[in-house]
């Protein structure tokens, strides 16, 4: 699959305030916090990413109210930057759920009291206890290529995202979920992709409603994923971005959203000044842990770092990365790095697994290994992203 990118350039005025927003100042911040209990598994992360995009390729067709219109949501950093979640409040009175914020999908679903097999540690939303809940009558079901799945019913309710109150948001209440979801530290998923890939067609995403209900006046959200070496955590800012979190100016990149994703073109890859790949397409996906590359690109990168193929989508790599040059991608008119300290994803004794791997596609998935080193502002209304190295 190849993306056909928008040919016209999108030009945005860059402002210098610490927290940037539209003139009316409406935005919401969601901070990220840290969870040290999660353990990484590179093979599972690769399989999850492959299964996720296999599914979409097969498809046709705080509780207080924010007054300034800025949504700030902190997110928790699972063990060593593996995955991140933010807290969202649903219902009246509200129940706080830990959700995986995912730019690679578009559904808002979570464990509910109707679920017959949801994880015992998951917080479960009870529609019978919310005065603002309304039944929808439709059902939903998600099946992934690795055999995992979830299903349930649709409804609507009030959703508070970083202090901004979304009315009549469509929610997906899980009645059943596979064991892969039961054992995770999150209660569900909040999709930040485009509405063309919602499981039930015609459903408005939370970002759609933030814009249409006038809760944010600047149709963007800024993503900062903290690194464990800097204390972990991170934040999502809906309606703006935090210019203190990145260095220099933002580079504007056109997006191809024809498949419902934030698709960009990577012009090339280099290591230590030597070019190791030509151009390829990539998806910016906060819901994927690793940097998943096309097979040929991954092989060239692995060779440059002396990594060996494990033939399961992962590479074994030296645990001592002190002599490694950064992995550099040319995107638009700028270059963006994955530094040496991010090239190791998983360590087990003296053996290490690389933060990059490969899938079965001719495009890349730029997951958290890339995103925790580069600040990204997503604009779904005039589809483009803006990227800058983290400060």
UniProtKB/Swiss-Prot annotation:
Residues 1-21 form the signal peptide. The active site is at 102, 285. Gene3D superfamilies: Acid Proteases. GO terms for biological process: proteolysis. GO terms for molecular function: aspartic-type endopeptidase activity. Residues 22-68 form a propeptide. InterPro entries: Aspartic_peptidase_A1 (IPR001461), Aspartic_peptidase_AS (IPR001969), PEPTIDASE_A1 (IPR033121), Peptidase_aspartic_dom_sf (IPR021109). Belongs to the peptidase A1 family. This is Rhizopuspepsin-3.
């Amino acid at each position: 699959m190849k993306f056909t990118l928008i040919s016209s350039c999108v030009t945005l005025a860059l402002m210098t305030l610490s927290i940037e927003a539209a003139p009316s100042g409406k935005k919401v911040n969601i901070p990220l916090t840290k969870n040290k209990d999660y353990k990484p598994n590179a093979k599972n992360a690769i399989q999850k990413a492959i299964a996720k995009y296999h599914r979409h390729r097969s498809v046709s067709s705080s509780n207080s109210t924010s007054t300034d219109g800025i949504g700030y949501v902190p997110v928790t950093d699972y063990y060593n930057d593996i995955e991140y979640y933010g807290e969202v409040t649903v219902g009246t009175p509200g129940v706080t759920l830990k959700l995986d914020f995912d730019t690679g999908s578009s559904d808002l679903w979570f464990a509910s009291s109707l679920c017959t097999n949801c994880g015992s540690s998951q917080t479960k939303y009870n529609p019978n206890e919310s005065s603002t809940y309304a039944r929808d009558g439709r059902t939903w079901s998600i099946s992934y290529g690795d055999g995992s799945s979830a299903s349930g019913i649709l409804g609507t309710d009030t959703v508070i995202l970083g202090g901004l109150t979304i009315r009549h948001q469509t929610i997906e209440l899980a009645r059943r979920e596979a064991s892969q979801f039961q054992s995770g530290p999150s209660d569900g998923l909040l999709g930040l992709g485009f509405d063309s890939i919602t499981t039930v067609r015609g459903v408005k995403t939370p970002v759609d409603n933030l814009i249409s209900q006038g809760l944010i006046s600047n149709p963007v959200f800024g993503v900062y994923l903290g690194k464990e070496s800097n204390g972990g955590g991170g934040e999502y800012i809906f309606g703006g971005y935090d210019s203190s979190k990145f260095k220099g100016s933002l580079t504007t990149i056109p997006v191809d959203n024809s498949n419902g994703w934030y698709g960009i073109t990577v012009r090339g890859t280099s290591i230590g000044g030597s070019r190791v790949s030509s151009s390829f397409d990539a998806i910016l996906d906060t819901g994927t842990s690793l940097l998943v590359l096309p097979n040929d690109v991954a092989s060239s990168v692995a060779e440059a770092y002396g990594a060996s193929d494990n033939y399961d989508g992962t590479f074994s790599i030296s645990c001592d990365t002190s002599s490694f040059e950064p992995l550099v991608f040319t995107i638009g008119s700028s270059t963006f790095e994955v530094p040496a300290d991010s090239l190791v994803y998983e360590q087990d004794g003296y053996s290490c697994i690389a933060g990059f791997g490969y899938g079965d596609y001719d495009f890349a998935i730029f997951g958290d290994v890339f995103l925790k080193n580069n600040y990204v502002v997503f604009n779904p209304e005039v589809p483009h992203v803006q990227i800058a190295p983290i400060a």
